[in-house]
């Protein structure tokens, strides 16, 4: 676990009208919470998209013909870098705004809390966390709960068991 301040650059882009969407400041806060104690320096991008772009990306990268809530694209270090060189580039998150809004309404969650959860979830994927099996899923979900609790956000998995 690392201590001390995080040097963090979060570039947020909106591929749809910004009305009703979280601010870049909010995304930075949520990413910082996910990284706290885990990494000291990071650059990443968050892109908010419509369903058409979300579906296209999900099809291209995962072979799924629907838009999903969040996609994580970890950065890959360029070949040929000298050993020991560390690059702060963590990767990209793509968040499909209409899917997030629909899920929040269906699940009775505040929109901000759902965006926070998905941003934390996606950021953990960039750090290498996954949920391919029950054990991994349980560990990742517990970490998400802890991070969100630190942000004052209720357990996103409450009532799912």
Swiss-Prot record:
Q: Which domain of life is it from?
A: Bacteria
- EC number(s) from the headed UniProt entry: 3.1.-.-
Name listed for the protein in its UniProt record: Endoribonuclease YbeY
The alphabetized UniProt keywords are: Cytoplasm, Endonuclease, Hydrolase, Metal-binding, Nuclease, Ribosome biogenesis, rRNA processing, Zinc
Q: Which cofactor does it need?
A: Zn(2+)
List the InterPro entries hit by this protein, alphabetically.
Answer: MetalPrtase_cat_dom_sf_prd, YbeY, YbeY_CS
The compartments listed are: Cytoplasm
Q: Which organism is it from?
A: Xanthomonas oryzae pv. oryzae (strain KACC10331 / KXO85)
Q: Which NCBIfam families match?
A: rRNA maturation RNase YbeY
Q: What does this protein do?
A: Single strand-specific metallo-endoribonuclease involved in late-stage 70S ribosome quality control and in maturation of the 3' terminus of the 16S rRNA.
Give the family, as the similarity comment puts it: Belongs to the endoribonuclease YbeY family.
Q: Where is the signal peptide?
A: none
Q: What binding details are noted for the cofactor?
A: Binds 1 zinc ion.
Tell me a GO biological process for this protein. Answer: rRNA processing
